[in-house]
Structure formats: structure tokens, C-alpha cells
Amino acid sequence: MASTRGYVNIKTFEQKLDGNKKIEGKEISVAFPLYSDVHKISGAHYQTFPSEKAAYSTVYEENQRTEWIAANEDLWKVTG
């Protein structure tokens, strides 16, 4: 079910941390009502832009709240 209120398209950038650790960059599109209800952006390196249709292949619709919460946390996952 495509959002009738548009999407927030999020592009995060790779962040190198101490040692060999990093946070991977990602591109996702989130239905606006879901994004406005649940999102974490503090201290992040990211950009967003609104659009009528999803801009990226990874898309979270309004009925995917649980999946979006997990993916939102994963945006800031440290690896390495």
C-alpha cells in the first residue's frame, strides 16, 4: 500500500569511528506519517528530502511500524 501523503527519503553517510569501526551509509524511503511518528536523527550524518513517490528501493509503508523501528535503529549500528 503506497502512502497517500508522500515519503521522506533518507540517505545516511558512512561514518568512520575509532579503530576499524564504522557506521554504514544507507538509502531508504519511509512513508511520511510513519517517519513523523518514529525516527531517530540525533548526532547523525544524513540528508532527507520529501517526494510524492519513494525515491529508494528500500521502502517502509505506514503499516510497517515495527519494521521501520528496527531499520531506524540499524541506521546507526556500529560495525567493524
UniProtKB/Swiss-Prot annotation:
Disulfide bonds: none annotated. It is found in: Virion. The keyword Cytoplasm does not apply. Pfam families: Soc. One of its GO terms (cellular component) is viral capsid, decoration. Keywords: Capsid decoration protein, Capsid protein, Virion. InterPro entries: Soc, Soc_sf. It comes from the Viruses. Belongs to the Tevenvirinae Soc family. Homotrimer. Interacts with the major capsid protein; three soc molecules associate with each interface between the major capsid protein facets. HAMAP family: SOC_T4. Capsid decoration protein which helps to stabilize the capsid against extremes of pH and temperature. Once maturation and expansion of the capsid has occured, trimers of soc attach the interfaces between the hexamer of the major capsid protein. Acts as a 'glue' between neighboring hexameric capsomers. Dispensable for the head morphogenesis and phage infection. This is Small outer capsid protein. It comes from Enterobacteria phage T4 (Bacteriophage T4). The lineage of its organism: Viruses, Duplodnaviria, Heunggongvirae, Uroviricota, Caudoviricetes.
